[in-house]
Structure formats: C-alpha cells, structure tokens
A protein has these predicted regions:
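Mobile, glycine- and charge-enriched loop segments
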Residues: 1-25, 143-144, 149-151, 155, ...
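Divalent metal-coordination and catalytic microenvironments
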Residues: 9, 29, 44, 49, ...
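Conserved beta-sheet core of the metallophosphoesterase superfamily
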Residues: 156, 162-234
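Core catalytic region of metal-dependent phosphoesterases/phosphodiesterases
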Residues: 2, 14-116, 185-189
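Structural motif
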Residues: 2-4, 43, 122-123, 147-149, ...
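Conserved catalytic scaffold of divalent metal-dependent phosphoesterases
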Residues: 65, 87-178, 213
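Accessory, non-catalytic peripheral segments of nucleic-acid enzymes
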Residues: 38, 43, 231-356
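Active-site environment of divalent metal-dependent phosphoester hydrolases
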Residues: 11-15, 52-55, 81-93, 117-118, ...
C-alpha cells in the first residue's frame, strides 16, 4: 500500500492578464511537488486542467510548467496526469491535447483514455473529461470496484459550482432517457476523487471534488485551498492547506476597517458599496485601499431599493443558466422535438462554455 498525493485544476495561466498571476500558479505547482518530496509519497495524481488555455498556449507558460515538472522527474515517485477539458483541443475528443508531451519525462504518465492502473499496491480507475460517464465507465473493469479508487474529471449533479452557492444540474442522454449524473454512480468505489469544479467538497462519504490548489477567481472567494495525502493502507486522508497564495475577497464598504494589511496585502478585493460615492467618500476609500496594500481592487454597487421577491426570483433564474434553458424550451414551439433531450444538450453546451 502507498501514500498518494492528489491535486487538481491548477489552470496555469497569467489570469487577469497579469504576469504575477502566472507566477502564483507556478509557485503553487512547485509547492505541490515539494510537498510530495517532503511527505515521501509513492505517487502524485493530478485530476486534470494543468493549463488554462485550450488551443493557444503561451510558449513561456508552457516552458515554465515543463521546467518545473522536469525538476521532479528523478524523484522516488511517479506522477500521473489525467486529461481535463482545458487540456483538450476538441470538446468531445481526447486525441489532441496539451499534456501529451509531459509523458516523455521520466516517471511521468499522461492518462488520456479510461484506464485501470496499479499504483503501489492499490488499483485506480482513471476517467478523463467526459460528457457521458455512464458510457465511459463501461470501458473500465466492472469487478471488485469496492476495493478500487477512481480519479475522474467531470460534472456531477448537485455539486457546488462556486462560492456564491450555485449548484450543478447535470443530466445526459443514456439508454434513450435523460438521466442525472449524480454521486450514486460512483458509490461502488472505495473512494472517488474528481477534478473539474474548483471548490473542494464532499458529495458523499466516498465521493469528493479535490478542488483547485489556489484561488483563481472571485468565484472561489472565501474558499480554503488544499492538496490531499491519501494513505491507501489505512484509507485515511490528510488535507494540506495552501496558506500562501493570494486570495479573493468580497467586502462591504463599511466592513473594510475590520481587515488588516496582513490579510489583504497582495490580495484581490471587490468592495461592495451601497451607492454612488461622493468625491470625499471616494477619496477616503482610496486612502484605506492604499494603506491596506491591496494589490487589485474593483468596486461593486448594491442596488438601493430591490424587493426581496425580486432578488429571490433572480436567484432562481439568473444564477443558474440551466433554469434559463428550461424556461426557453418551455416557451418556444418545439413540439416536433424531444424536449428533455433538447434541454440536456443545451445544458451540456452551457457547461462547456462556462468552463471556458
């Protein structure tokens, strides 16, 4: 049996068009592998989306990632890189992808199709990004899954999409019906780990999203980030927190004074104001921002008079693009088409676009 490090969805890229954000990603990537060395793990498993850009990858970004991985090619552990949707050129084919060259490194394996692999005494099923896990799980051995682990990159119904609380609504066409892709599909496994959604979360005792190792956007504001060390002998997990990468904050204007410079320095902050600021108030706010050393800031204005029922209606519809799709199909004339299938296709398109 073995000690295995799991991480996912690092999306290396100069996010926000800032070189510093690229450096944040590279620093987090080094930290992951340094932890693997320090913890003396037997393997590193990555759950997909190593790079952010799908089709036009910056040469500097790609080279720096390659250099970091190359530094760990002679360590006493093997690294397995699973294919995520951001690693794929085509949305529905694994054939062309950006992680393939990393498989040329010693002790690195890229997994670009469903595969069963024995890793230091434990058996793992790998499931690259898929729109239809029902179909692709059938490509893996069915027997004795209760003793095996799964690492996949996909959408699961009911999972949290972001820190605002939006929830995934995921269905696919299977055997002529629209079927929910829910956590029960993976209940047979000893433990199932997933990449794709960036918020670490447990959907069941044995089903969880690993989450990204650093905050990449305001959609991850307030989320703690970690990597996982799995002891397959004891089937126990240690969560190692990333306490160094910049964070994202939503802060009400009147609460800004309650934060320290240490908390906000080099962070990304969205200050929520109650209305348009006077010249004097704007100057006071700018002084506070400067004194706190905030690296990046944007302002967001609250509506002054919005009734509760309007807010609730907006949350029900606008916060979830799936609701918009369902509403649209209800209102247009599509009697000659299967509405459930049409809605399912729309949701898949929306999910793919939102992942971009």
């Amino acid at each position: 049996m073995a000690k295995i490090l799991l991480f996912s969805d690092i999306h290396v890229h100069p996010h926000k068009r800032k070189h510093e954000r690229l450096l944040d990603c590279l620093k987090a990537l080094r930290w992951v592998f340094d932890q693997a060395v320090e913890k003396q793990v037997d393997a590193v498993l990555f759950g997909g989306d190593l790079l952010h850009e799908r089709q036009k990858i910056d040469s500097f970004t790609y080279t720096e990632v390659f250099k970091i991985l190359e530094n760990y090619k002679n360590c006493n552990f093997r690294t397995y890189l699973l294919l995520g949707n951001h690693d794929m050129w085509f949305s529905n084919s694994w054939s062309v992808n950006s992680i393939y060259p990393f498989g040329s490194l010693n002790n690195f394996t890229t997994v670009i199709e469903p595969k069963e692999i024995s890793i230091s005494g434990s058996t793992w099923h790998f499931l690259p990004y898929t729109h239809n896990p029902f179909e692709d799980l059938q490509k893996l051995p069915m027997e004795d899954r209760s003793s095996k682990y799964l690492l996949g990159h996909l959408s699961i119904d009911g999972a949290k999409l972001n820190s605002a609380g939006s929830v995934a609504d995921v269905s696919v066409e299977h055997d002529g019906d629209m079927v929910k892709v829910d956590r029960s599909i993976f209940k047979e496994y000893k433990h199932a780990y997933f990449g794709h959604y960036h918020g670490a979360q447990k959907l069941a005792k044995n089903v969880e999203y690993i989450g990204s190792p650093l905050q990449l956007s305001f959609g991850e504001a307030g989320e703690d980030k970690h990597i996982i060390i799995l002891d397959t002998n004891k089937n126990t997990q240690e969560y190692i927190k990333n306490d160094f990468s910049p964070k994202h904050y939503y802060i009400d204007e009147e609460n800004l004074d309650s934060y320290s410079r240490e908390e906000l320095e080099k962070s990304f902050v969205c200050i929520v104001t109650k209305g348009d600021l006077s010249t004097e108030n704007k100057k006071n706010l700018e002084d506070k921002i400067s004194n706190l050393g905030i690296d990046s800031v944007k302002l967001k204005t609250k509506s002054k008079e919005v009734s509760d029922h309007v807010i609730n209606d907006a949350k029900l519809v606008l916060a979830d693009e799936n609701k918009i799709i369902e509403k649209y199909v209800e209102q247009v004339q599509v009697d000659h088409l299967e509405k459930d299938i049409l809605i399912g296709l729309g949701k898949r398109i929306a999910e793919y676009e939102s992942a971009e």
